[in-house]
Amino acid sequence: MPRSQKNDNFIDKTFTIIADILLRIVPTSQREREAFTYYRDGMSAQAEGEYAEALQNYYEAMRLEIDPYDRSYILYNIGLIHTSNGEHAKALEYYFQALERNPSLPQAFNNVAVICHYRGEQAIQQQDIESSKAWFNQAAEYWKQAIQLAPGNYIEAQNWLKITGRI
């Protein structure tokens, strides 16, 4: 039984029901339906902190999914898991793959910026001022792209850009 059919909370159950209805109404192939089921199960596992299970589901969804736009969200979520696990280099790989397929994904730009900013902070702690400036400048560029795509979001990033004179 797919994980999505075992959900106990109201929101997950509602989402599952609506998604199932849409999958019946909208013409989709069996492969697309399977890919979506794995994606949905991955999101459910991820929300519960079951990252290994989520990754298994996302990898299976990637194997089945052929649409670049849909694949971008799977890749983005894989990046989120690696970020949560502190695997920033791996997370960046997945965020960049997501952006290759969908350059209108502001949350991926934001997360890349957050990792760059974090690395800038680490460089400061190591007394490496030149590296910190480079990381912060990279963070600024990615935040600018995220803000351009979603102007009402990322207020803290907008403030940081203003305070640091990068906007």
UniProtKB/Swiss-Prot annotation:
GO cellular component terms, A-Z: chloroplast thylakoid membrane
Pfam families reported in the protein's UniProt record: TPR_1
Signal as UniProt keyword: no
Database matches in InterPro entries: PSI_Ycf3_assembly (IPR022818), TPR-like_helical_dom_sf (IPR011990), TPR_rpt (IPR019734), Ycf3/AcsC/BcsC/TPR_MFPF (IPR051685)
TPR repeat copies, ranges: 35-68, 72-105, 120-153
Its membrane topology: Peripheral membrane protein
SUPFAM superfamilies cross-referenced by the UniProt entry: TPR-like (SSF48452)
Gene3D superfamilies: Tetratricopeptide repeat domain (1.25.40.10)
Subcellular localization: Plastid, Chloroplast thylakoid membrane
Keywords, ordered alphabetically: Chloroplast, Membrane, Photosynthesis, Plastid, Repeat, Thylakoid, TPR repeat
Gene Ontology BP term (one): photosynthesis
Function: Essential for the assembly of the photosystem I (PSI) complex. May act as a chaperone-like factor to guide the assembly of the PSI subunits.
Homology family: Belongs to the Ycf3 family.
Cross-referenced NCBIfam families: PRK02603.1 (NF002725)
Protein's name according to its UniProt entry: Photosystem I assembly protein Ycf3
